[in-house]
UniProtKB/Swiss-Prot annotation:
Pfam families: Sre. PANTHER family: SERPENTINE RECEPTOR, CLASS E (EPSILON)-RELATED. The chain crosses the membrane at residues 34-54, 66-86, 124-144, 168-188, 195-215, 256-276, 286-306. This is Serpentine receptor class epsilon-32. It is found in: Membrane. It comes from the Eukaryota. It is a multi-pass membrane protein. GO terms for biological process: sensory perception of chemical stimulus. One of its GO terms (cellular component) is membrane. Belongs to the nematode receptor-like protein sre family. Keywords: Membrane, Transmembrane, Transmembrane helix. InterPro entries: 7TM_GPCR_serpentine_rcpt_Sre (IPR004151).
Length: 361
């Protein structure tokens, strides 16, 4: 959505928001908003349980937690921005004009822009658009920050595991957040072109792939040396643990990268198709919500990849317990019958041997 602000001196200012408004009957908008809220509440539960399990069962280095936990937490801000958009769709926020239909991610067509003389009444919508941009670029730069931290852990294997200094994750967090906020503001105020807005994705994916290969090669080489009985280098327990942690994080990262790449590809294709009217605007609901509902594949991938997390996640997740209880009811009944039969046989056996013993007396 592009907003064009034309002041009295005829100077135009543009704002670029990643929000969508549809030309649909009001009753249908209410229904679609209710359905979206149901899915968001489910995602809220899933994300909260995942964060709880990650913090309760800490199997990675503290620095890694400091980096990637905020990446999960900013999803709550993303949903807050979406709720603001829903409030404008359902006209909970009164405006003196109609917002109209805006389903293009970006456009230079003046007819498809929202023309206003001031931003009065749009402050919340602009804030909601900013937090959505911030989430996208936080994930982009955050993944690069995690890759950098694992690369540093591979280089400083001699003492990284025993290092209690927090300057590495704090410095990486400050850098990634500075880049995320500055890029979000640049895109929001339309200071960056369409190509420049996509450039961080390209750079991050390229550098992330190089960091992935570097971490993989270095740590697999260390693992071969550790398992080699004729090795010349002595590895301490903490160093061996660090190598295993790097490889475990790499395995988890590989699965998450594939999930994220699929999401980026699907959403990008959807935005392209909608921008050039290749598909009906009705599909915009699905493309848009693919971003907001990302905890489903990402959290499930993270939780079910690591056995320690999987066990606690299954015990804590309300939905998982419901499904499990539904499937285990018949088994529970059968098990109870088997236990009862076993106890009866044991009692009869004890009675037989007691009577046999008494007959010998």
């Amino acid at each position: 959505m592009i907003i064009k602000i034309l002041d009295p001196s005829k100077n135009a200012t543009y704002l670029w928001l990643p929000v969508y408004f549809y030309d649909e009957p009001f009753q249908f908008q209410i229904l679609s908003s209710i359905i979206e809220l149901v899915f968001y509440i489910s995602c809220f539960h899933l994300m909260t349980i995942s964060l709880y399990v990650m913090l309760k069962v800490q199997i990675f280095h503290r620095n890694l937690y400091i980096l990637y936990i905020p990446m999960f937490c900013v999803w709550y801000g993303l949903i807050a921005g979406k709720l603001i958009t829903i409030a404008y769709r359902l006209k909970f926020v009164d405006l003196d004009y109609e917002l109209g239909e805006h389903i293009a991610m970006w456009t230079d067509d003046q007819a498809k822009m929202l023309h206003v003389s001031s931003l009065r009444g749009l402050e919340l919508l602009i804030f909601g658009g900013f937090v959505q941009w911030h989430y996208m670029y936080t994930v982009v730069y955050g993944i690069l920050g995690v890759a950098a931290e694992r690369a540093i852990a591979s280089v400083l294997i001699e003492n990284y595991e025993t290092n209690t200094q927090l300057y590495i994750p704090i410095a990486l967090t400050i850098i990634t957040q500075f880049l995320a906020i500055s890029t979000s503001l640049s895109v929001l105020f339309h200071k960056a072109s369409v190509f420049l807005s996509h450039l961080p994705w390209i750079i991050s994916c390229s550098l992330g792939a190089l960091a992935y290969l570097f971490i993989k090669i270095v740590n697999e080489n260390f693992q071969k040396q550790i398992t080699n009985p004729r090795r010349k280098r002595l590895f301490t327990i903490s160093q061996q643990f660090q190598v295993k942690e790097n490889l475990r994080a790499l395995r988890l990262g590989t699965r998450l990268v594939f999930v994220v790449f699929f999401y980026v590809a699907f959403v990008s294709f959807g935005m392209f198709a909608l921008a050039f009217d290749l598909v009906s605007s009705a599909y915009c609901h699905f493309v848009e919500n693919f971003l907001f509902l990302n905890p489903y594949p990402i959290c499930f991938t993270a939780m079910l990849t690591i056995p320690h997390w999987r066990k606690h996640f299954q015990n804590a997740c309300f939905t998982w317990r419901l499904v499990k209880s539904a499937w285990t009811k018949p088994k529970t009944s059968t098990t109870s019958v088997e236990i009862s039969t076993t106890k009866k046989l044991e009692a009869e056996t004890d009675l037989y041997f007691r009577q046999l013993n008494e007959s010998w007396i």
